[in-house]
Swiss-Prot record:
This is D-ribose pyranase. Belongs to the RbsD / FucU family. RbsD subfamily. The gene is rbsD. GO terms for molecular function: D-ribose pyranase activity; intramolecular lyase activity; monosaccharide binding. It comes from Vibrio parahaemolyticus serotype O3:K6 (strain RIMD 2210633). InterPro entries: D-ribose_pyranase, RbsD-like_sf, RbsD_FucU. It is found in: Cytoplasm. The active site is at H20. One of its GO terms (biological process) is D-ribose catabolic process. Transmembrane segments: none annotated. SUPFAM superfamilies: RbsD-like (SSF102546). Pathway: Carbohydrate metabolism; D-ribose degradation; D-ribose 5-phosphate from beta-D-ribopyranose: step 1/2. GO terms for cellular component: cytosol.
Length: 139
C-alpha cells in the first residue's frame, strides 16, 4: 500500500503524469464539468470530502506555480477564499517557490476548465469553491 498522504489511485496517477503548466481543476459539487475532460468524482455527500481537504492533499503531492480563481469567490464565500489563500501561502513558504494567483470571472473560469487534464469534484457546497492548479517543476 502507498505510504504517502495521497492514496486515491486516479489522482495519484494524474499528479505523477503532470507536465509543466498542465492544469487540474478542484471544484465544488456544482461546477459543470466538460464531457471531454477526465472527471475524478470524490463527492460522497454534502461537504464530504471538503474543498480544503482535497486542496491540501493534492498540494502535498504536487508542485504548483499558479492558480486561477473566480473573482466571485472572495465576495460570496470570503471565509473559504481566505482559507485557500492561507494554504497557498503556506505551500509557497514550505517550497520556497512563489505561486501566482490569477482572478477571472466565473464564466471565464468555467471556460478555462476545458483545458484541464482533469477535474476533481469534491462534496463542497460552498459557492465558487473552485480552483485551477497550474503545475510547476520541482527543480
Amino acid at each position: 500500500m502507498k505510504k504517502s498522504t495521497l492514496i486515491n489511485s486516479g489522482i495519484s496517477y494524474l499528479v505523477a503524469t503532470l507536465g509543466h503548466t498542465d492544469e487540474i481543476t478542484i471544484c465544488d459539487a456544482g461546477l459543470p464539468i466538460p464531457d471531454h475532460v477526465q472527471r475524478i468524482d470524490l463527492a460522497l455527500t454534502h461537504g464530504v470530502p471538503s474543498f480544503l481537504d482535497t486542496v491540501r492533499v493534492i498540494l502535498s503531492e504536487s508542485q504548483i506555480e499558479g492558480v486561477i480563481i473566480a473573482e466571485e469567490f472572495s465576495d460570496v464565500s470570503p471565509v473559504l477564499h481566505e482559507a485557500l489563500l492561507k494554504e497557498l501561502s503556506k505551500e509557497s513558504e514550505e517550497t520556497g517557490k512563489s505561486i501566482e494567483i490569477k482572478y477571472v470571472s466565473h464564466e471565464a473560469f468555467k471556460a478555462r476548465t476545458e483545458q484541464s487534464r482533469a477535474v476533481v469534484r469534491t462534496g463542497e457546497c460552498t459557492p465558487y469553491a473552485n480552483v485551477i492548479f497550474q503545475a510547476g517543476v520541482v527543480f
